[in-house]
Amino acid sequence: MLDVKRIRNDFDALSEKLATRGVVAETLNELKELDVKRRELLIKSEELKAQRNIASDDIAQAKRNKEDASEQIAAMQKVSAEIKEIDAELAAIDEKLNTIIVTLPNIPNDSVPVGADEDENVEVRRWGTPRDFDFEVKAHWDLGEDLGILDWERGAKVTGSRFLFYKGLGARLERAIYNFMLDEHAKEGYTEMITPYMVNHDSMFGTGQYPKFKEDTFELDGTDYVLIPTAEVPLTNYYRGEILDGKELPIYFTALSPSFRSEAGSAGRDTRGLIRLHQFHKVEMVKFSKPEDSYDELEKMVVNAENILQKLNLPYRVITLCTGDMGFSAAKTYDLEVWIPAQNTYREISSCSNTEDFQARRAQIRYRDEADGKVKLLHTLNGSGLAVGRTVAAILENYQNEDGSVTIPEVLRPYMGGAEVILPK
């Protein structure tokens, strides 16, 4: 959530920045007008309350002197009625202001490229060379069926589209991948967590999913519970409403969790395979940082995600998202895209973002600065480390062999009882 004072004090510059994120001028002009009116009413309210206090003192004095205080009482009643009217008007303005503020996206960092959509994202670097196959490559969904490790048909029967069963070495491969990821992040100082898989609406508001993106989630009817779309939500809200000791920062969390997404706007996209599911596993990284350190922490987080891909020997590239393609809460985002041979392209496997104080303001997560003793908003960061299903897809396609088998990456073999290859059924 943005700071109204910051918008007020730097309106023109921030309006330009928010325009690059699709915020129309009329919205910000309405916010400005409401803010001006609100401050005018607050001044008037304070003046009237001062008059009421004086009138109250005059009434008390008159009563002590056994004088008629009817005029003072009438005057005070009139002032009190005016105050009540102003308070009602202020409440209505506050509601309108809040409705606008909670739907405004974060302000992009100056280093973020300006652009309308993914076509204007900027490539930062690449790692690894895509393998040159001397046979026709199969898509991971075909490989999974041929190997007997992914069952789409029964997933659809039991639940519906975009669901599947992992089976045998497929289930073991997925488990090996996320255990490997968690172990690697633990080496980098992340505290491993097991979170609730349901959160309340306040938590969804805190990280920016609510109220704007309700349609993308699964809610439990008749309750305050929502199935988590990512472990970012419970991990970030772990400190909601708390004041941390500045000496403890930065704090690193990592967690494996299922992610539940309705994919409301994805009809017709990635209808086959592991790229876009209603339920999938993801290892998440979350950081709590002092503001002055948060961009260094973002770069470190990207390196942590890259480390997984490099140890799996999967070719990838790092992209800086432009203003028009960033997520709602992000001030800056890097995407890591892994090479998918059957599609002859790179696909997102991790997204690492610095939200600056956007989520911290919504969730009221603060710290006491040991230098001056003041309580301040901290910065929160989040990133995938990595999306597990997409990692399975990348391994199946990049490690496939001409005979239909799939070689298991070396770093995963200790997690799979020493198995080196998955053979066709």
Curated annotation (Swiss-Prot):
Residues binding ATP, per UniProt: 261-263, 348-351
UniProt KW Protein biosynthesis keyword: yes
Organism: Streptococcus thermophilus (strain ATCC BAA-491 / LMD-9)
Description of its domains: Consists of two distinct domains, a catalytic core and a N-terminal extension that is involved in tRNA binding.
Listed InterPro entries: aa-tRNA-synt_IIb, aa-tRNA-synth_II, aa-tRNA-synth_II/BPL/LPL, Ser-tRNA-ligase_type_1, Ser-tRNA-synth_1_N, SerRS_1_N_sf, SerRS_core, tRNA-bd_arm
Subunit annotation: Homodimer. The tRNA molecule binds across the dimer.
A cellular component annotation (GO) from this entry: cytoplasm
Any GO MF annotation of the entry: serine-tRNA ligase activity
NCBIfam families: serS
Family assignment from sequence similarity: Belongs to the class-II aminoacyl-tRNA synthetase family. Type-1 seryl-tRNA synthetase subfamily.
Keywords for this protein: Aminoacyl-tRNA synthetase, ATP-binding, Cytoplasm, Ligase, Nucleotide-binding, Protein biosynthesis
Entry protein name: Serine--tRNA ligase
GO biological process: selenocysteine biosynthetic process; seryl-tRNA aminoacylation
Role of this protein: Catalyzes the attachment of serine to tRNA(Ser). Is also able to aminoacylate tRNA(Sec) with serine, to form the misacylated tRNA L-seryl-tRNA(Sec), which will be further converted into selenocysteinyl-tRNA(Sec).
Keyword Nucleotide-binding: yes
Residues reported to bind L-serine: 230-232, 284, 384
Enzyme Commission number(s): 6.1.1.11
